[in-house]
Amino acid sequence: MLYLNHQPHPHSPKTQRALRAADGYLYLGMAEEALEEITGTAETESDQPEVLLARNRVLLHLGRWKEVEALAAHAIKCHPERDEFTVQRAFALHKMKKGDLALSVIDAAPEWIRRTGILHYNLACYEAQLGDIKTARHCISVAIQMNEAMRKNAKSDPDLRGLYN
């Protein structure tokens, strides 16, 4: 996954532990356990971007598209500067067969996000993680056409491993 403007916020020890544990569980393919860990974050920190992003990444792995879309829509309102939520919302809408709405989300994204290729890059990551290698290859190709520097990131990104093996 490639992020822009990633500036982590300080978290309580409880939330830091939950985020690290959830990431570990997700890496091991244990999405339900990861979701349990995210649920253990401090309530006062539940709307922080890193917590919202982590929760939505788990929901993506679980294929809970309606929840992904709703949480991403909320997160876009709370944190409009975070591009990841736009990508997540568009992807969830795409998976729910609401392509027109997905395109409207992408069209509504700030111009600077659309110019960087980050939307296509992150869509490639999601598709690769969910096993649609053909679509992932198309998305990463578009991203690289928009920004050649993404080629280097793509080759070392663990989310895109399936494209290069």
Segments (PLM) and residue ranges:
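Alpha-helical adaptor scaffolds
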Residues: 49-118, 126
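Alpha-helical segment of the N-proximal tetratricopeptide repeat
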Residues: 11-44, 50-61
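"A position-specific structural signal for the A-helix of alpha-solenoid helical repeats
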Residues: 16, 20, 54, 88, ...
